[in-house]
Structures are given as C-alpha cells and as structure tokens.
C-alpha cells in the first residue's frame, strides 16, 4: 500500500494523500471545473458531478470500498505505485504519455496485439470473399488439348450447345471485340464439339479474326448476345418455297443458332461443301462471304446455316454451311431433304451420321471428292 511520500512526488504539495482506488487529487480537481461528471466517474464517486473538486473526496472512498476487488486496474498507474480502476480512466491517467521502461513495454505490447487483431480480421474477410486462396485456372492451350482429346464422335455436337450459352469468362467484352481476336474465346469454341482433326483451325488466331468484325449496332457487339430464336428468314423475300418450308414452329425448335466460328473461311474447308449447282438465286445483301460477318439487321441464325450464291458463276465456289446433327437436331435432316436444296447437301448430312466410326476422316471430304470426280 502506498504511503504519503509516494503521493507527494507526482502531486502538488497542497494535495491530500489518497487511498487506493482513487485517482490523484490534482488531476481530477483540474478537470472537475470543466467536466465535473467525467471527474466524478474517474474518482468513482456518486456525487462527483456536482461536487466539483470534491469529486474524489470521502464519498469516493466509500464507493471504492464497495467495488469488487477483481475489477481491471490501470497498468501504468500500477507501475508507479497507484491502483486505479481502468473504467473511465484512460483520459485522466497521469502516466499515459510516460516513456519509462515499464510503460514503454506496455505500449509495445498494445501495438503488437492491435496488429494481430487487425490481421485476423483481414484474414476472416478474405476467406469470406474467397480472395485468400484463389483457384488456379488452366490456360487456354491446356483446355484445347483436354477437350479435343475427349471428343469421341466427330459428327456429334455437344448436347448443351442447342440452348445453353457459353460461360461468361469466355465471351469477349465489347472493348476486346473491337476488330481483334481475344485468345480466351477459343475454349468456348472447343466446348461446342470440335473434331479431333481441326486443331489447325483452333490454334490459328488469324483464322478466327475474320469472324469478329466490329458490329454497327451495340446490341450485337457481344458474340453470343443475340436472342435464341430470333429467326428472320433470309430466303423469304426471294424464294417462297424455302420460306414456306422454314416457317413452322417445329423448325424453330429443331434449328439451333450457330455461333460465328462455324462460318467458313478460306482455310476451313472441313465445314464447307461446294455445291455444283445453286438453284436459289438471292440478292447480294443476304449472301455470306468468308471475309464479311453476318449483317446485323438479319437474324443471326438463318444467314449462317444456309448461304446461297447468285448465278452459275464457278470462279468463287461459295459454301453451303451446315451444322452436324445431334440427337436434338433431327429436324435439320428432314429439312434438307424436303426443301428444294441441292442433293449434295442432304447427302453430306446423312453421310456425316454414318461416319462416326471413322474419327480421322470427315464425311464432307469424301463428298467433295465424289463431286470433283463427277
């Protein structure tokens, strides 16, 4: 228990010695004129708010003796011989800025504990958001090799390609699709069922750069951001027979919208069929060249499934693009056989179904050789 000499060192000579549990008189008395309630709370007295300088007087002794002895005490006051309750005492502690050896150890311990609390809080927030342990994503080349090796049937498309859209990570952003090809679009192409022998088409970005022309309208600047069944029939205005055969609702359900990588280019002859005769002349605005993307004012599906050439000009052999049928696309086979299309296209579709046992050779190449022999 501290004696009178201990109290006299930090205090003024006019002060009265205090009992344990009460703060020094000079510090509490100095603050009691401006904030009597705060000094009364620091002294632990009930009448300290109105008593002024007597906030830590005899009433403080009475209330301090009634408190539980296990209340937390101020560590800085304890280093200098005082036992002060810690509650409400931080602003009025006389040694809060003390730089002695014991008080500096207290300050260092408080800084370390505060840093640990902040670190634990930050780690908890990162684990909730999933930032601290990111899942490593495979590169585009690994996805290509993996998905091409898993393709067992070259003529069948993936079953989810008729209605499901590709994942958002593989779709190009509007800024990225402005006139150049982004390499992360290639896994979306392989997920739609490429063959095993078209690795030269997949790995060449220059081949795909001819398809991603910047659109004139902002609605179509994303590649797959068109309605699923927006089929404005391109052949309706010029050939009525094809329009009538395509106009029914079962045809809309059986024909899926082809993505733009299946539009043919000069090197992609695996997806092309040279028609020896074209019986449906159409105007030039509906005709699809390999270097020109689909017009934005047309439906995005009809102009990509069938392309016609006008007149019997054989200098440029334009291609009739077809989609290899899956189990959901039986309407495409019946459409090509019932509509007045060329016999070569229907024969190519039927032969593609029977060529599933030969993964190395594609059925269209056989049809092309037969047409050249004739």
From Swiss-Prot:
Biased amino acid composition, Gly residues: 41-63
GO molecular function (one): cis-regulatory region sequence-specific DNA binding
Biased composition (Polar residues): 354-364
Main location: nucleus
Annotated region described as Disordered, given as residue ranges: 1-73, 154-176, 317-374
An individual GO BP term: negative regulation of transcription by RNA polymerase II
Effect of loss of the gene: Severe defects in the adult testis with hypoplastic testes and disorganization of seminiferous tubules and absence of germ cells, due to pre-meiotic germ cell death in testes. Sertoli cell fail to differentiate. Female mutant mice have normal ovaries and are fertile. Depending on the strain background mice also show testis teratomas: deletion in 129/Sv strain causes a high incidence of teratomas, whereas these tumors do not form in C57BL/6J mutant mice.
Subcellular location, record wording: Nucleus
Compositional bias per record (Low complexity), positions renumbered to this chain: 24-40, 326-346
Tissue/organ expression: Testis-specific. In adult testis, expressed in Sertoli cells in all regions of the seminiferous tubules. Expressed dynamically in premeiotic germ cells (spermatogonia), with high expression only in regions of the seminiferous tubule that are early in the spermatogenic cycle (at protein level). Expressed in all mitotic spermatogonia. Expression decreases with the onset of spermatogonial differentiation and disappears at the initiation of meiosis.
Modified residues (Phosphoserine): 337
Gene Ontology terms: cellular component: cytoplasm; female germ cell nucleus; nucleoplasm; nucleus
Membrane-spanning ranges: none
Keywords annotated in UniProt: Activator, Developmental protein, Differentiation, DNA-binding, Metal-binding, Nucleus, Phosphoprotein, Repressor, Sexual differentiation, Transcription, Transcription regulation, Tumor suppressor, Zinc
Ranges annotated as DNA-binding: 70-116
Superkingdom assignment: Eukaryota
Heme keyword on record: no
Role: Transcription factor that plays a key role in male sex determination and differentiation by controlling testis development and male germ cell proliferation. Plays a central role in spermatogonia by inhibiting meiosis in undifferentiated spermatogonia and promoting mitosis, leading to spermatogonial development and allowing abundant and continuous production of sperm.
Sequence similarity: Belongs to the DMRT family.
Protein name as it appears in the record: Doublesex- and mab-3-related transcription factor 1
Species for this entry: Mus musculus (Mouse)
High-level lineage: Eukaryota, Metazoa, Chordata, Craniata, Vertebrata
């Amino acid at each position: 228990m501290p004696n009178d000499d201990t109290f006299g060192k930090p205090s003024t000579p006019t002060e009265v010695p205090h009992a344990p549990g009460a703060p020094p008189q000079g510090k509490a008395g100095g603050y009691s004129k401006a904030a009597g309630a705060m000094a009364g709370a620091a002294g632990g007295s009930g009448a300290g708010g109105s008593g002024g300088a007597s906030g830590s007087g005899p009433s403080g002794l009475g209330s301090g003796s009634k408190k539980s002895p296990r209340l937390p005490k101020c560590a800085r006051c304890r280093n200098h011989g005082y036992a002060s309750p810690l509650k409400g005492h931080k602003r009025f502690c006389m040694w809060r800025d003390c730089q002695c050896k014991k008080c500096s150890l207290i300050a260092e311990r408080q800084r370390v504990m505060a840093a640990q609390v902040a670190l634990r809080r930050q780690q908890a927030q990162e684990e909730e958001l999933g930032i601290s342990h990111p899942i490593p994503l495979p590169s585009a080349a690994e996805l290509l090799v993996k998905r091409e090796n898993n393709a067992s049937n070259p003529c069948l498309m993936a079953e989810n390609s008729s209605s499901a859209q590709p994942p958002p990570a593989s779709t190009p952003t509007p800024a990225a699709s402005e006139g150049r090809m982004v390499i992360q679009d290639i896994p979306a192409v392989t997920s739609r069922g490429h063959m095993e022998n078209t690795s030269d088409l997949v790995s060449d970005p220059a081949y795909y750069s001819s398809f991603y022309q910047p659109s004139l309208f902002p609605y179509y600047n994303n590649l797959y951001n068109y309605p699923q069944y927006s089929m404005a029939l391109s052949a309706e205005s010029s050939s009525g027979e094809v329009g009538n055969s395509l106009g029914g609702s079962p045809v809309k359900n059986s024909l899926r919208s082809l993505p733009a990588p299946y539009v043919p280019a000069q090197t992609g002859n695996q997806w092309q069929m040279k028609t020896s005769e074209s019986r449906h002349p159409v105007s030039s605005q509906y005709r699809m060249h390999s270097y020109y993307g689909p017009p934005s004012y047309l439906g995005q599906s009809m102009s990509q499934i069938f392309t016609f050439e006008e007149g019997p000009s054989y200098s440029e052999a334009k291609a009739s693009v077809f989609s290899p049928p899956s189990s959901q696309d039986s309407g495409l086979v019946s459409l090509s056989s019932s509509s007045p299309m060329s016999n070569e296209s229907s024969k190519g579709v039927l032969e593609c179904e029977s060529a599933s046992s030969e993964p190395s050779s594609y059925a269209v190449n056989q049809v092309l050789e037969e047409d050249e022999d004739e």
